[in-house]
Amino acid sequence: SPALMRLMNYSIGLYDQFKAEGANNIGWHKVGSLRLASSPNRLKALQRHVSRARGLGLDVGTISAKEALDIAPFINPDGIEGAVHIPDDGWMDPNGIALEFAKRARELGVAIETNCRVTGIGRDDAGAVTHVETDKGTVQTTTVINAAGQWAPRLSAMVGAITPMVPMMHQYVTTRHIPGHELPEQTPVVRDPDNLFYLREEVGGFLVGGFELEPKTWAADGVAWDFTQQLLPEDWELFEPVMEGALRRIPLIEQAEVIKLINGPDAMTPDGHYCLGPVPGVPGFFVAAGMSLNGIAGAGGVGKVMAEWIIDGEPSLDLHEMNIRRFGANYSNTDFVAEKAREVYHYYYHQHYPADETLWARNHRRSPLYDQLAELGAEFGEKNGWERVNFFRPGEPSRQAADDQHQWGWGRAPYHDLIREECLAAREHVALFDMTSFGKFEVSGPGALGLLQRVACNNIDRPDGSLVYTQFLNAHGGIESDLTVCRLAGDRFRIIT
């Protein structure tokens, strides 16, 4: 994600600045990183990522297996097709950077109250925030930022809002150093997605974590307020595939004495992206949560864009994929959210392709025409919980798009000819489109036309009954929405998007 890259890049610069100003206690270890490609397709994907990252100004490059071995001599080079090297990457101590942020905030006049639980959020008749109630008293304010981590859904519920995320069990193991094979402090972070693990140095030994194949949610209905400074029971059976992958790539680990397997919950959103921005319908209430295992890496950038959102009314980056408004009422279904979060976690290290479809938590929402479409041989994809037709295979049974799409990679998918025939039929004859899953809005009143003419990039002033395909633009000329406007009559318009 270009947006996530930019947020992380800003964070790195900020942490470098802190160290340059003498904050050596933040635990920022700028040791670089290696992301290994243990398959040809993984190497192709990494090369694509490198091209995009360089376009954003990141210092990153693709290196050979031999060069990777020179940087991290403890890895087994068998099967490595290449790697990505990021010299400015690293790892840091969460406690150290949190304390540094708190220290600098206090120096700017911020009051920090610990062990203080929010019990309610007051709102006026228009729904805007007026105050926060706590077990230590009431705070008058018109701006609230919900940065409550895995407790964020419970806090948002106080204003009737949805912030969908579910804590996932996330484990890592630490080992003692191996005499004669102590890892130096400058050991780079190593990630091997094909083997499911990541690794870094910890007091001369190994710290190994990863993404289990059968992820488990925890406290999906809400995390208890008093769950603090606690861990979950270790689960070696769950962690086994990660450990096996690490041992394949780094056999030396087998000689290390295990200190402990750490199991700590971390909140994951249904699509793996942050939840940021103002909550629709609750003026003054903002969310900065759902970090989905990228919290520390993006923290500095998230703080910057949240400040911009509050002060300027918009962030300096295009954050549509992270905007909290992307989640509608259907994400109030806890089971649906939990299954989507599990899918994101399960596929976190899998290779992704343009034609990929989500496979879990399907049939959440169906059109009234679903059965008729299925009878016509529809192949269904998923969009925002809706089962939507990707294309038809006339005369064949209906099906859901599945893992078989991975075999096409970045190449031409075999269904292109089917879609071509559908396009020709729509152009030359008559076609019926199921618009159930699209959003529909009505804009009406004396100022309706003027408003639409201002925000749309096409001419909306057409005769009654006209359809205008257009985009809504922001103040910078960027696209906010792709839509069709139907002029129902005079000053009444229907928007379909």
Identify the residue ranges that each predicted region occupies.
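Dinucleotide-binding Rossmann-like beta1-alpha1 core, especially the glycine-rich loop
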Residues: S1-I71, D194-L199, G204-G205, R342-P354, ...
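Short beta-strand to alpha-helix junction loop
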Residues: R6-N9, L36-A45, V84-E107, E113, ...
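Short Gly/Ser/Thr- and Asp/Glu-enriched loop/turn motifs at secondary-structure junctions
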Residues: H29-S33, M168-H170, L261, G490
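Helical element adjacent to the flavin cofactor pocket in flavoenzyme catalytic cores
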Residues: V84-T143, W151
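Conserved positions in beta-strands of structured domains
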Residues: T119-G122, I259, G277, C486
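Flavin-dependent oxidoreductases
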Residues: G120-E234, P241-I250, D335-Y347, Y353-E357, ...
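C-terminal catalytic lobe of FAD-dependent flavoproteins
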Residues: D194, V203, W225-R365
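Glycine/proline-enriched, intrinsically flexible loops and inter-domain linkers
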Residues: I324, G328-T497
